[in-house]
Amino acid sequence: MSSYENHQALDGLTLGKSTDYRDNYDASLLQGVPRSLNRDPLGLTADNLPFHGADIWTLYELSWLNSQGLPQVAVGHVELDYTSVNLIESKSFKLYLNSFNQTRFDTWETVRQTLERDLRACAQGNVSVRLHRLDELEGQPVAHFHGTCIDDQDISIDNYQFTTDYLQHAVSGEKQVEETLVSHLLKSNCLITHQPDWGSIQIQYRGRKIDREKLLRYLVSFRHHNEFHEQCVERIFNDILRFCQPETLSVYARYTRRGGLDINPWRSNTDFVPATGRLARQ
């Protein structure tokens, strides 16, 4: 259980509550969650963040009416900057997108600008939005995370409670290595509803070699942990940086979609360009 799971800042969220679906545009449906909720316990403040990054959202269920009433569909790509005051709560995002369904917009650009304006207001930070026609995306191959998968280890696990203990003394040798490690076994739970969130994670670092068994045990320990996607990625970044002390570090997770949305947060302290192709489970 997260230390802030019952924080009053979460009281007003529609997440976990019965809600009506509106199909006429309503920006008030968007709800933000302060990033400080998970950053404060980690000792992170806006002026001492050890990373940069973004939350990348893919919007698969986006539709509206053109000026003549003909339905339009698109796939949206949203990038929410890590410096925003709030992250966007996903159920409210879904409800907000549904409100476009029976609303007329003159142009695609008007839709894009509307999304960008509303998301920036909710997040209190920088947001960029791109809209793609379906024929732009047809035929795109399923992508994969570059790196060495650490999942196929012959180990026994019987503890699924989150702990950083596995990262203590998890590095060895004095030689600097540079490697990219991948796991598809990341599973955490929604902070509010405790529904499972499934993801794949890519960890790039340069530093003393990290023990792969200990790293995998640490990642598996999220299995009963309740936090939002973005919060988990920041926790993983912070824990690896704290205990393993790599010179450079990038952590990137791509989660399976829910409600027509997938969330793909990344954090890095070096030059890092995230590949945005959808993975096999997305």
Swiss-Prot record:
Its EC number is 1.7.1.13. GO terms for molecular function: preQ1 synthase activity. It holds the Pfam family QueF. The active site is at C190, D197. GO terms for cellular component: cytoplasm. Signal peptide: none annotated. It catalyses: 7-aminomethyl-7-carbaguanine + 2 NADP(+) = 7-cyano-7-deazaguanine + 2 NADPH + 3 H(+). Substrate binds at I88, E89, S90, H229, E230. The keyword Acyltransferase does not apply. Transmembrane segments: none annotated. It is an enzyme of class 1 (oxidoreductase). It is found in: Cytoplasm. NADPH binds at S90, K91, R258, G259. Keywords: Cytoplasm, NADP, Oxidoreductase, Queuosine biosynthesis. InterPro entries: GTP-CH-I_C/QueF, NADPH_dep_7-cyano-7-deazaG_red, QueF, QueF_N, QueF_type2. GO terms for biological process: queuosine biosynthetic process; tRNA modification. Pathway: tRNA modification; tRNA-queuosine biosynthesis. It comes from the Bacteria. Homodimer. Catalyzes the NADPH-dependent reduction of 7-cyano-7-deazaguanine (preQ0) to 7-aminomethyl-7-deazaguanine (preQ1). PANTHER family: NADPH-DEPENDENT 7-CYANO-7-DEAZAGUANINE REDUCTASE. Belongs to the GTP cyclohydrolase I family. QueF type 2 subfamily. This is NADPH-dependent 7-cyano-7-deazaguanine reductase. The lineage of its organism: Bacteria, Pseudomonadati, Pseudomonadota, Gammaproteobacteria, Enterobacterales. The gene is queF.
